[in-house]
Amino acid sequence: PHAASLKNIFTEAYLHGHNLAHATRILLNSLFQDYGLVIVDGNDTQFKANCATIMQDELFNQSSEKIVNEVLATFPYEAQAKPRNVNLFYLQRNLRERIIYHSDKDIFEINNTSITFSPEQLKKEILLHPENFSPNVILRPLFQQKVLPSLAYIGGGGEIAYCLQLKSLFQYHHIQFHMLLLRDSFLLVDEAAQKKLNKLEI
């Protein structure tokens, strides 16, 4: 009974939205308009500016790689994500590429482009255009917790392990580390598997 209205909502969102993020906001606001949903644009300049100190440390100290690799050296679980020497992307229109630091030349290169920055140029870029930088999987939780602090994170086993390998990084940046709660899960056992379990007395 709602097919026509849903089609109109999707059409309005994805044909008239300025970009994918804007279209998704239109869609979610339409679907949850009666529930007071708050939508945050992770690429907002002010939000990114709040994380400028993390970006600067990442670019000029490469702390994430050192800290996370120290944790992984004695980590009791399989590594969920491995750090690079710079865990940031550089963004421009139709461009999202890794930032690579070349210590021998002391320059930063934007992967798959001819764009390079000196340290001073990159410091200025962060100051003037923090929205041009985006965290990868290692830094994203820190950005999120700094901008929108949460008390607890509920996740599966792999997700909890992922958070645990970043705990020291949170402490280094003086960002409160949320409580971790393992979500309920279940395993569906079919008849054949159940027979084997019974036979093995498991």
Where would I find each of the regions flagged by the language model?
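N-terminal targeting/trafficking signals and adjacent low-complexity tails
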Residues: P1-I202
